[in-house]
C-alpha cells in the first residue's frame, strides 16, 4: 500500500479516509456522483473534499471493475493524476488541490483512489447549456449561463494549453462555473506535453462536440455565436 501526499499531511493521513463506508459511519458523506469513476463529496475536519475511486470503462469493466495491471507506482492512475494536479496548483491554474492518493497492489494488479479539494460552484458548463437550450429537460434549473462565461472558458483553456496541460476528456461536464471563476476538473489520463496545435485543437474540438451533444443542437445560430465568443477568449 502506498499513500501519496504532501509532507505536511503525511503523518495525518488515515487509510480509512479512502473508504466510502468510513465517511458514511461518521455521518460525513455529503453526496455522490457515480459515473465511470465514482466520486463522493465528504466533510473532513479541513473542509469539503472529493473522494474518487477509479473504475474501468468500456469492455474491460465487464471483466474487472476496478483493478488495473501493475506497471509500477509512477504509472498508476491515481499517482499520475495527483502529480499532475500538484503541478497545476504550482502553476496557479484553477483546478482542485490534491490531498492524497492511495495505491494498493494485489499481485499483478492494483486499485487506487484519490482525495482532492471540493470546488464550490454554482453549476457545471453542461448544466448552464441545458438551462438555456433544453427548457423541458427535467434536470434544468433557473441558473443562467451568462455570455461572459463563454469568453472566460476560452481564456482558461488557453492558460492550460500555454502551460502544456493536456486534458484527456475536455467536455462541458468537466468545467465548473462559480460567479466570475472557471475551474477545470477530472485530469485522469491527463499529461504535461510540449504545446502543440494538433492536440490542442483536438481538445477544443472535443469540447465543441460535447456542447453540441448537451444542447442537442449542432447548426444553431445562437450556439455558433457563443462558440465564437469562446474562441475569442481562447485566442486573446
Regions found by a protein language model. Name each.
Residues 1-16, 23, 96:
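Broad phosphate/nucleotide-binding scaffolds in NTP-utilizing and phosphate-metabolizing enzymes
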Residues 18-125, 158, 162:
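Conserved ATP-binding subdomain of kinase catalytic cores across diverse folds
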Residues 120, 172, 189-191:
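Short, glycine/acidic-enriched loop or turn micro-motifs at the edges of active sites
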Residues 124-139:
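AlphaC helix of the protein kinase catalytic domain
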Residues 141, 182-236:
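C-lobe/activation-segment region of protein kinase-like
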Residues 145-156:
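Conserved alphaE helix
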Residues 164, 169:
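Conserved catalytic-loop position in the HRD/HxD motif
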Residues 170-177:
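Hydrophobic residue at the +6 position relative to the catalytic HRD Asp in the kinase catalytic loop
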Amino acid at each position: 500500500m502506498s499513500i501519496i501526499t504532501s509532507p505536511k499531511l503525511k503523518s495525518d493521513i488515515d487509510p480509512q479516509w479512502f473508504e466510502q463506508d468510513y465517511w458514511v459511519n461518521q455521518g460525513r458523506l455529503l453526496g455522490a456522483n457515480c459515473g465511470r469513476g465514482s466520486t463522493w463529496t465528504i466533510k473532513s475536519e479541513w473542509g469539503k473534499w472529493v473522494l474518487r475511486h477509479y473504475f474501468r470503462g468500456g469492455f474491460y469493466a465487464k471483466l474487472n471493475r476496478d483493478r488495473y495491471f501493475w506497471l509500477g507506482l509512477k504509472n498508476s492512475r491515481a499517482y499520475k493524476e495527483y502529480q499532475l494536479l500538484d503541478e497545476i496548483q504550482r502553476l496557479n491554474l484553477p483546478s482542485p488541490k490534491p490531498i492524497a492518493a492511495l495505491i494498493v497492489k494485489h499481485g499483478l494488479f492494483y486499485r487506487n483512489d484519490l482525495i482532492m479539494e471540493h470546488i464550490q460552484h454554482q453549476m457545471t458548463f453542461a448544466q448552464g447549456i441545458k438551462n438555456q437550450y433544453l427548457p423541458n429537460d427535467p434536470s434544468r434549473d433557473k441558473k443562467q449561463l451568462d455570455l461572459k462565461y463563454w469568453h472566460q472558458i476560452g481564456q482558461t483553456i488557453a492558460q492550460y494549453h500555454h502551460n502544456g496541460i493536456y486534458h484527456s476528456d475536455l467536455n462541458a461536464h468537466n468545467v465548473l462555473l462559480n460567479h466570475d471563476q472557471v475551474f477545470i476538473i477530472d485530469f485522469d489520463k491527463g499529461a504535461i506535453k510540449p504545446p502543440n496545435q494538433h492536440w490542442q485543437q483536438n481538445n477544443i474540438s472535443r469540447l465543441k462536440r460535447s456542447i453540441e451533444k448537451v444542447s442537442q443542437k449542432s447548426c444553431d445560430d445562437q450556439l455558433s455565436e457563443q462558440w465564437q465568443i469562446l474562441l475569442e477568449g481562447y485566442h486573446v
